[in-house]
């Protein structure tokens, strides 16, 4: 079972919006007002980029700065719902557990240590926000996983699309970034 990190294991929607708005000032794109969050949850990553005027060629730098900002807030980030119980039950049942994230490995490790969740067999970190399918393929190869044996748990349209593209099973949570309607 491979989990996405941000907004699936770790609850950071609000922190993510705050950081996005800090980066908007720094990189010159539109802020996301809190009253627009519900609408934004219905958009794909590319759709949100278009709406806010985020240029693709700056995406890597913006993502890197976002990860830096997130590292300052990691001790304030809480796990989502009953995810701690679920992860512990899966581990106790003998499932191999992994994390696939665009966040940094040090941020993820700090979170796992804070909540005594060092139960994961691997953390695969990639700064690539778009093209998650290629990251999944690399993960499958690196950790010698068969697509038919993998369940990916995520919260975004891009997670669903990447799972379909790579032939892995997908479970979408509804408490994360994208709305229930958008990930069906």
Predicted regions and their residues:
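N-terminal helical cap/lid subdomain that shapes the substrate entry/recognition surface
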Residues: 1-84, 93
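Short beta->alpha linker loops
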Residues: 15, 40, 78-82, 103, ...
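A short, structured active-site edge motif that brings together acidic residues
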Residues: 36-37, 117-130
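Short, acidic loop-to-helix structural element flanking the phosphoryl-transfer center
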Residues: 71-109, 113, 133-134
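Core-facing hydrophobic residues within beta-strands of well-ordered domains
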Residues: 87, 119-121, 147
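Conserved Lys-Pro-Asp/Glu-containing loop-to-beta segment of HAD-superfamily phosphomonoesterases
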Residues: 133-160
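Acidic, Mg2+-coordinating phosphoryl-transfer loop and its flanking beta/alpha structural elements
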Residues: 151-184
């Amino acid at each position: 079972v491979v989990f996405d990190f941000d907004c699936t294991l770790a609850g950071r929607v609000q922190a993510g919006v705050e950081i996005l708005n800090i980066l908007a000032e720094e990189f010159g794109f539109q802020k996301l007002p809190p009253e627009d969050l519900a609408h934004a949850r219905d958009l794909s990553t590319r759709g949100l980029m278009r709406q806010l005027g985020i240029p693709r060629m700056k995406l890597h730098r913006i993502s890197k700065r976002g990860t830096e900002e997130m590292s300052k807030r990691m001790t304030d980030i809480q796990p989502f719902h009953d995810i701690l119980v679920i992860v512990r039950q899966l581990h106790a049942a003998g499932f191999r557990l992994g994390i696939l994230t665009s966040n940094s490995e040090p941020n993820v490790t700090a979170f796992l240590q804070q909540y005594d969740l060092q139960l994961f067999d691997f953390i695969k970190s990639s700064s690539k926000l778009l093209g998650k399918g290629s990251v999944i393929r690399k993960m499958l190869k690196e950790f010698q996983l068969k697509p038919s044996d993998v369940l990916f748990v995520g919260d975004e349209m891009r997670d669903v699309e990447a799972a379909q593209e790579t032939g892995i099973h997908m479970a979408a949570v509804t408490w994360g970034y994208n709305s229930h309607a958008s990930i069906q």
